[in-house]
C-alpha cells in the first residue's frame, strides 16, 4: 500500500521540525487490503498497479519523467521542443532555474504531481483545498503560491483537452508550487502553465 502523510510543502514549521506521528499517517492498501485500522506495517517498495492507479516510492517527479519520455516519442515534427529533466524542485526550483536560463524558452509547461483530495484532510474535516481528484484526468493549474499561470496557455490546454475528449480538471489556486515559479522569471518573463498528475 501507500503510506500517506502531509507533503512537506503543505506542512507547518512545527510539523517540519518534528517526526511524523504514527497516528497522522494513513495506509491505502487498495480494494484488496485485508489490514484493519491500527495494524502495524513494514516497507516493501515495489512498483505496482492497483486497479487503474500505480503505486511507487518517490513517484512525484518520476511520473513527470515518464510523461516527458512519452512526449518525446510522439512529439510533433513541426515544433522546436526542448525538455528539461530538472532536480531540486522541492528545495528551491534550482534545476528549473538553470535550465530556463540555458534554453531561454518562448513558453514553458511544467509537469509535476499534485495531492489528490479524495480523502478528508489530516484533521478529519472535509478537504476543500486544491479540489483535484483521482480518475478525473490531469490537473491544469490556474495559480499557486509562486505562479499565476498564463491564461492563454490555460485556455490552450483546455481547448486541446475538449477537442481531443481528454478528461481534465482545473487545480484551484492554493499552496505548493512547480518549476514554473522560476521558469517564468527568465529574461523579461516566460509564459508558463503547470500540468500535474493527481
Report the location of each language-model feature.
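N-terminal hydrophobic/helix-forming segments and targeting peptides
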Residues: 1-198
Amino acid at each position: 500500500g501507500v503510506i500517506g502523510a502531509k507533503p512537506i510543502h503543505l506542512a507547518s514549521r512545527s510539523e517540519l521540525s518534528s517526526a511524523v506521528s504514527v497516528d497522522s499517517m494513513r495506509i491505502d492498501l487498495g480494494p484488496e487490503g485485508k489490514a484493519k485500522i491500527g495494524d502495524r506495517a513494514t516497507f516493501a517498495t515495489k512498483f505496482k498497479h492497483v486497479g487503474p492507479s500505480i503505486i511507487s516510492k518517490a513517484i512525484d517527479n518520476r511520473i513527470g519523467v515518464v510523461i516527458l519520455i512519452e512526449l518525446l516519442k510522439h512529439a510533433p515534427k513541426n515544433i522546436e521542443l526542448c525538455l528539461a529533466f530538472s532536480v531540486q524542485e522541492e528545495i528551491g526550483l534550482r534545476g528549473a532555474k538553470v535550465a530556463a536560463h540555458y534554453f531561454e524558452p518562448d513558453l514553458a509547461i511544467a509537469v509535476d504531481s499534485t495531492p489528490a483530495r479524495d480523502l478528508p484532510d489530516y484533521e478529519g474535516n472535509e478537504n476543500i483545498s486544491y479540489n483535484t481528484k483521482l480518475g478525473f484526468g490531469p490537473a491544469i493549474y490556474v495559480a499557486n503560491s509562486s505562479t499565476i499561470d498564463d491564461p492563454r496557455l490555460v485556455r490552450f490546454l483546455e481547448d486541446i483537452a475538449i477537442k481531443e475528449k481528454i478528461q481534465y480538471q482545473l487545480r484551484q489556486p492554493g499552496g505548493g508550487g512547480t518549476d514554473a515559479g522560476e521558469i517564468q522569471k527568465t529574461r523579461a518573463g516566460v509564459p508558463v502553465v503547470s500540468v500535474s498528475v493527481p
